């Protein structure tokens, strides 16, 4: 059953060795992942000022820029042309502005930024009015568990006295995952019922997808989740930032975006795997 797969791998392996040269370093930018060499590959790309340092750029865009003589983040930031062949003019302008903001923000505690959309139904205009009941929540998932396990739920909010609060739910198995899901939905639904101006902020689509997945997995809280979704209680801040701002950071992860509004942390933030 695996003969064709093995033959293909063997062919690729032998072809790699035929072309291998001690004097020719592989280009990290041509790899999809670096495994245990991630830090070293990052150093090479950083030293080369490679175009992959530009936030949200794609491999196809990099190839087209390089074909037109733009081979570094600095060259893109300094580009004098208004467009290049086979690339949308607006996309090129956005990439150039992104590169320029990143170059200008280097060695700065607070990155440069630019508003790029201020009309209805896009960008910052999607932010709803403030409510004292607003909250922010995040989920961490463990993909190596069968069908995944949403093992950590964290929520920040303000209580009735105005003091900052934090709730967390942990799950080490499927039963605890169900309990975390139902407890979270019960709590936020009651909070929203008492204040229909409340919104639940999150960063990226993962949280909403996880709630839908758990609702289907356990067959509970369909009414509550559907009601919250239909009333647009959930607000994706990642979508708002991507549509509304250009930020001089190499990534638009929340760990990078927070450089806009808070001082540099004294400690490292744990990744999902580390947590």
Q: Could you describe each region identified by the protein language model?
A:
Residues 25, 39-45, 50, 58-64, ...:
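Short, flexible coil/linker segments at or flanking structured domains
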Residues 1-19, 157-159, 166-275:
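Conserved DEDDh/DEDDy metal-dependent 3′-5′ exonuclease domain
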Residues 1-28, 36-40, 46-52:
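Accessory nucleic-acid engagement/destabilization modules that flank
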Residues 29-157, 165-166, 177:
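C-terminal extensions
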Residues 18-23, 33-36, 136-142, 212-216, ...:
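Short, mixed-charge, low-aromatic patches
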Residues 24-32, 270-274:
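Short, surface-exposed recognition loops or helix-turn segments adjacent to catalytic cores
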Residues 13-24, 61, 72, 83, ...:
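Short secondary-structure junctions and interdomain/linker hinges
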């Amino acid at each position: 059953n695996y003969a064709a797969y093995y033959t293909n791998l063997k062919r690729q392996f032998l072809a790699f060795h035929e072309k291998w040269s001690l004097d020719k370093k592989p280009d990290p930018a041509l790899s999809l992942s670096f495994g245990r060499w991630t830090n070293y590959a990052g150093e090479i790309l950083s030293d080369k000022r490679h175009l992959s340092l530009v936030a949200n750029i794609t491999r196809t865009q990099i190839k087209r820029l390089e074909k037109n003589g733009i081979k570094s983040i600095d060259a893109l930031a300094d580009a004098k042309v208004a467009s290049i062949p086979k690339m949308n003019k607006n996309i090129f302008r956005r990439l150039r502005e992104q590169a320029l903001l990143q170059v200008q923000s280097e060695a700065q505690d607070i990155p440069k930024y630019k508003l790029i959309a201020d009309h209805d139904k896009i960008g910052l205009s999607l932010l709803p009015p403030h409510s004292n009941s607003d909250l922010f929540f995040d989920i961490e998932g463990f993909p190596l568990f069968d069908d995944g396990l949403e093992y950590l739920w964290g929520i920040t909010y303000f209580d009735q006295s105005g003091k900052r609060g934090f709730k967390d739910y942990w799950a080490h198995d499927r039963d605890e995952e169900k309990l975390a899901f139902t407890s979270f939905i019960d709590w936020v639904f009651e909070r929203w019922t008492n204040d229909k101006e409340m919104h639940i902020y999150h960063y990226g689509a993962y949280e909403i997808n996880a709630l839908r997945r758990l609702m289907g997995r356990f067959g509970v809280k369909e009414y509550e989740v559907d009601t919250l979704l239909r009333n647009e209680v959930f607000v994706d801040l990642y979508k708002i930032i991507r549509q509304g701002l250009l930020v001089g950071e190499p990534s638009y992860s929340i760990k990078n975006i927070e450089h806009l509004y808070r001082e540099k942390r004294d400690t490292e933030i744990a990744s999902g795997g580390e947590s």
